[in-house]
């Protein structure tokens, strides 16, 4: 996970080697393969962006912005469009500096997502990052459904030198969070990180469990800054969008951790997510 706040595009580039190469290679072929900026040029460009999983909506917005700038600046040569295109993509992916306020406030960060996306690893890395910034961190191991989830998280907590509160396998996750919230308040913790079960979006009872956790935090820790991060696997492409949509119906999602960015040639999903939902990708995992 990239931890430095260098602006989303810079962090994205670090985690997107394969994707960037493929998309840029495709874009370069358009710029070198056309001698005029016409409908065919824009069509080819759209196709390459969509193939890179940037998605139809984001691609349309990017290309429309490019057309507008080409007209305003009276550009005739396709080669002169490249930087404009990069700027147009950047505009779709801006993350405001206030998006990271939760790192500085007394906060509760709930981390959600389906199984297998790298959720527990993300919690562990985030705990280590915050600890390195001299924040007092506590982890709540509320994934009590999956065998060994607690052990895996305990290993990450130990590595980060951060205390953890967890329940036995099968314990009520909301009660684990209740205990963790009270411990956080008693110990003067800066950041409480809550790891949740891999809530498969077709399991209604698991979604209800998430709502219960939400209510416990709201009731017991009302003055804490709330941050709900969803972990999405970039290799699942457009399927990540449907996962986000399902979880959005259950809780307010404030940011995204996008994992496995080097395992896919279609990391353009990062652009699609932000353009479609306006939810910033705050961390990149590889």
Regions found by a protein language model. Name each.
Residues 1-98, 104-111, 128, 132, ...:
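Non-catalytic terminal/linker segments enriched in charged/polar, low-complexity residues
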Residues 90-286:
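P-loop/Walker A NTP-binding module and the surrounding RecA-like catalytic core of P-loop NTPases
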């Amino acid at each position: 996970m990239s931890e430095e706040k260098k602006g989303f595009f810079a962090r994205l580039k670090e985690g997107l080697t394969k994707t960037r190469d493929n998309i840029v290679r495709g874009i370069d072929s358009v710029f070198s393969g056309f001698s005029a900026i016409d409908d065919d040029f824009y069509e080819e460009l759209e196709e390459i962006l969509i193939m890179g999983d940037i998605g139809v909506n984001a691609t349309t917005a990017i290309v429309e912005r490019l057309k507008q700038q080409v007209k305003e600046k009276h550009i005739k040569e396709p080669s002169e469009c490249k930087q404009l295109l990069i700027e147009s993509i950047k505009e779709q992916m801006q993350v405001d500096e206030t998006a990271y306020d939760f790192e500085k406030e007394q906060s509760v960060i709930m981390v959600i997502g389906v199984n297998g996306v790298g959720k527990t690893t993300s919690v562990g890395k985030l705990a280590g990052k915050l600890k390195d910034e001299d924040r007092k961190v506590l982890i709540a191991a509320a994934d009590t459904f999956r065998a060994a989830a607690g052990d895996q998280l305990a290993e990450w907590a130990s590595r980060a030198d951060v205390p953890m509160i967890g329940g036995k396998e099968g314990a009520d996750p909301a009660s684990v969070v209740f205990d963790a919230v009270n411990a956080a308040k008693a110990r003067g913790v800066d950041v409480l990180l809550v790891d949740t079960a891999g809530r498969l979006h077709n399991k209604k009872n698991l979604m209800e469990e998430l709502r219960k956790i939400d209510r416990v935090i709201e009731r017991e820790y009302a003055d804490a800054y709330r941050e709900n991060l969803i972990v999405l696997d970039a290799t699942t492409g457009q399927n990540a969008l449907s996962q986000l949509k399902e979880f959005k119906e259950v809780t307010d999602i404030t940011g995204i951790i996008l994992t496995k960015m080097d395992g896919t040639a279609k990391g353009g999903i990062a652009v699609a997510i932000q353009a479609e939902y306006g939810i910033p990708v705050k961390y990149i995992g590889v």
